[in-house]
Structures are given as structure tokens and as C-alpha cells.
Amino acid sequence: VPAMIERNWGRVVNISSAWGSFAEGLEGVPSYAITKAALNALTIHLAREAGPDVLINAMCPGWVQTRMGFDSAPWEPGGGLPELTPQEGADTALYLATLPDGGATGGFFRERAPLDW
């Protein structure tokens, strides 16, 4: 990030999770929610520190439709969140990485749309 600030240009896409916005409700996996909430806070802090020329955002998918996610889940996949395909996740990351100058910074996105938290 310091080199991006020095050049007055850059893009950072943090991969977080919709679970990082919840204060409770993840019985059995609070450490996951806590680490994602910390990443969300870091996204906001870095965006403020970097200024308007370095865009720092986070994509926050819910469940991604992969075998690994469903086999390892300690709770019911989905949990009320819409599922996302791997392609939709990749499209969101590409969208954020290629935002035009003056685009959103310090935001959280799912399927190219900002999340209201």
C-alpha cells in the first residue's frame, strides 16, 4: 500500500465474508467471524489512510458453491444467505480491481453491488 500511495494509484481487493458483519450467530466458529470483522475494519482504515487515489475495498460473498465449502461447514450451508457461484465471486473481484479513478473505496461488495452494513 505505501508504494501505491507514493504513485498515487492502486487497487486493493480484500477477500472477506458476509459473516464478518454479524456480531453473533455463528455458534461453533466465532473465530472465523472475528477474523473477517477485523479484515473489514482494516479495509476501512486503509481506505481512509490511502486517500482517494488508492481504492481499497472488500468483497464479501456468502456461501460459494464449492464442494469444499459444503463438506466442511459446521452448520447448514447458506444460513439464509444467497449462494454465489465461483464465477460470480471472480467477477466481483475483477470489478473491484478495475474500478475507474474516483470509484468506491472503503466499501464492501457482493456480486458487484455494495452491501449496506
Locations of regions flagged by a protein language model:
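Catalytic loop of short-chain dehydrogenase/reductase
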Residues: V1, I5-P52, F70
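Short, flexible micro-motifs
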Residues: R11-V13, A23, Q65, T92, ...
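Residue-level detector of flexible, active-site-proximal loop/helix-junction positions
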Residues: W19, W63, A113-L115
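Short beta-loop-alpha junction of Rossmann-like oxidoreductase domains
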Residues: A23-E24, C60-A73
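Glycine-rich, flexible loop/turn motifs
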Residues: G28, V64, T105
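C-terminal helical subdomain
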Residues: G51-V54, A58-M59, P74-W117
